[in-house]
Amino acid sequence: MLTAEQIEATLSDNDILDIVLDAEQEVIEGVQDCIDGHVLPLIIKGPPGVGKSQLVEEMTIAAGIISTDYIGSSWSAPDKDSGLPAYPYHCDNLVTVKGALMRGADYSVWALAADLYANKDGGVICLDDNDAILRDKTAGALLMKATEQRAVKPISYIKANSTHELQMYGVESTFNVNTSIIILTNLDMEEDIRIANQKQKDGTPKKEHISRWEAFISRGKYIDLQMNSPRSIRVYCEHKIESVKMLTQSAYLERTCGRSLTKKENAEALKWIRQNQSRLSNALDLRTYNKLASIMIRRANWQKSAEVSLLS
């Protein structure tokens, strides 16, 4: 039986790109289905820095989604002489965001409870490469409740009665939720589940978070972007750069460096990455190309500067 590496060796770059673009189209349809309430949760697996977050943000904004951010809002305590109870606080400035509420690695269980409560009647919560939350028992239980296939999804979090931040926001210990949830991850959940199930046959107990992941995939949708090798990541990045003119019509480069790359410089950048990908200090992603482009614009001897900055 051929390994994944052996199979990839038989494919052209165009073959690989077709596979990745088919997966990307599935993601686009999955995000829309999640927004519409047909898929819960949507799990998208892919490497960091290839545009997963941007796609979710753009699609949820285009759909007119408005999400509420209690954590980013301003709150003030009641006047001690007013006779009012200590909680909840008064919200001086309620923050809402266009599109999904994007939550990264610096995230805790109480924050998840706050986000679910703030968006219990709508909005989209997107957990963005937040592996710790996906393994946390309490957070997993909240997400399990929030993704049940039923019209009314009751959430229970008893610590809401004793957590200062949740008391401040007025988060109840029990509430119903109707929130679309998207999970972006570079964890290969399906492979981890396969390994755990095999070990279970040999007598090794399955970890709790693996069982929850199985439930998430069963009730929702799991999409692998098929960027599972350095070559497939490079092929997709090159396609993205060319299709959206990421380096030749770049608002980012024009703001930070005064101009974008010329077409000739763009070709040189792609060639340099191809020749040096195996020597990069960090895994290749779209940000790598922006870093290289910035060096090319700012340094006369850019090849030497790029070697020092980007290669190991």
Mark where each language-model region is.
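Walker A/P-loop nucleotide-binding motif
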Residues: 36-56
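Loop/turn-to-beta-strand initiation segments
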Residues: 121-125, 175-182
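A short helix-turn-beta junction within AAA+ P-loop NTPase domains corresponding to the substrate/partner-engaging
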Residues: 194-231
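N-terminal pre-Walker A segment at the start of P-loop NTPase domains
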Residues: 2-35
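Conserved AAA+ ATPase small/helical "lid" subdomain
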Residues: 233-309
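Short glycine-rich substrate-engagement loop in P-loop NTPases that contacts/grips substrate
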Residues: 65-123
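Conserved catalytic/switch belt of AAA+ P-loop NTPases
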Residues: 135-176, 184-186
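Walker B catalytic acidic pair
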Residues: 128-130
